[in-house]
Amino acid sequence: MESQGAAADLQRAQAFFDSRPLYERPLGVGHTVPVGLGSMSAASCGACHTEIYEEWKVSTHALAWEDRQYQVEIAKSDNRWLCLNCHTPLLAQQDVWPVGLIDDDVERPQLVDNSSFDADLRGEGITCASCHVREGVIHGPGLGGEPPHPVQVDTDFQSEALCLRCHQATATYPGKTFTCVFNTGQEWANGPYPAEGKNCVSCHMPEAQRPAAIGGPVRTVRQHWWRGAGIPKVAGVHPPPQANPPGLGLTAAWQADGVHIDAVNANAGHYLPSGDPERWVQVVVTFHNGAGQAVGEPWMQRYGQEWTWWPEPEKHGDTRLAPRESRSYVVPLPSGASTATVVASSHRMSEETAGYHELEGYPLSVETHRLTVRP
């Protein structure tokens, strides 16, 4: 679509976004660099906030743009503008802006080139400024002291509000083969944690005692790894294991009638798993005899959703664990068994789906538990 000039194009884009649901809008629309910063880049923030910057660099937020799964998904259709607003939430990160839809079709956006597009900033995905900059002003939780740049104290940073702009996004698009089913916020709201005063920040950004910036006093700050399933977006790039304790609690005991398994959603304030409907968690039990040979058939329990995507998305089942929900099983003992191995793992997608998308070498799963039980 023909440009009407940078200012007019920005105004048209803002008007369009204002007409859309929250999760279809960018988090920040301004381009003004806050006083005290050299640029909007994470590296500019990281010059002082060194530990936070190092945590962010290996987080899934930092890899939200270059994630290979995301790249193949947005290449399928002209609906990518729907996804950009969470994966690259600043307008300066987007090469084109939607200013309207042809026949109200989300796959036929009217686009104008963004004259302020910053490719390097786009590569940072969900970067510092995505959450902390609003119209040229740095926002934060308010730690006190005398920061070298102005900070607007913002209560959203102590609540779930910022997170749910993207992690509570549910929508159907009739006649389309895609849907948006990120219901994490509602899952949390329906669970026990709100009454206990715990929100997204409480678990996903645990407290640490350290300076917020170089030369500052030791104080209570928040870690910026954002706890999750622990499946890397890029092989070898991930937070340390302690940053992602598994949501699943798992115990196993050998009894006369079989191996007793107890599985509980112990640490996730939402369903386990949550978010992407293709994710699942599984528990597998295998048996061996005294010679180390496999006996009997493996037993498996899967926690996840079942969907078909053609001709329209349809959900067929949901076996996920609600917050603090527990389930117990007795796995029969095969003849000759003397040892049982219980392995739990978290999965991003199936090998079949990864093959379809030509995602060879893409990290698909992570083991979370391995238990050995004997009589």
Region roles according to the model:
Residues 38-40:
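Short glycine-enriched loop/turn motifs at secondary-structure junctions
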Residues 81-84:
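Active-site neighborhood of thiol-dependent amide/isopeptide-bond enzymes
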